[in-house]
């Protein structure tokens, strides 16, 4: 697993998926799963999860623990599970977060492993959906904000 140009390869993959989806709006993408376990996608997913920090899930494994184990080894094992259909998401760790009014709200914290897979899936499917979204849509989209939506209105 080479990490040096994963970002560029992922950008090219996403651009290709976006352009294909934009060109053929009736096209259905039946085979995106193989994109999730690509080396470059898993490496980029790892980098994004690591940059986002966050605490460990129910397994207690932290980002630092994975770095000590060896990122390449960890991602190879995860890739193998995904390819063989043996990947099973872990339960979510439930933490109660205090609200300003004194009550609490539940927060679910997935394991780092599950966050990597979720991010890899996001990397694969996001450009397909982006191609269908309208220009006037701003909610929860990359490189768009509430401020930009207000400027348009």
What residues fall within each predicted segment?
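Conserved pre-catalytic core of RNA-dependent polymerases
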Residues: 2-153
């Amino acid at each position: 697993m080479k990490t040096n140009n994963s970002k560029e390869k992922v950008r090219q993959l996403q651009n290709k998926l976006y352009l294909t989806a934009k060109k053929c709006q009736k096209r259905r993408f039946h085979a995106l799963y193989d994109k999730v376990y690509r080396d470059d996608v898993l490496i980029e997913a790892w980098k994004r999860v690591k940059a986002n920090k966050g605490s460990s899930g129910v397994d207690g494994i932290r980002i630092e623990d994975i770095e000590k184990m060896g990122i390449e080894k960890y991602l190879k094992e995860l890739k193998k599970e995904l390819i063989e259909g043996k990947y099973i998401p872990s339960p979510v760790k439930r933490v109660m977060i205090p609200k300003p009014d004194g009550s609490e709200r539940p927060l679910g914290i997935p394991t780092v492993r599950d966050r990597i897979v979720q991010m890899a899936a996001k990397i694969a499917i996001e450009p397909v959906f982006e191609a269908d979204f309208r220009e006037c849509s701003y909610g929860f989209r990359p490189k768009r904000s509430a401020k930009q939506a207000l400027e348009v209105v």
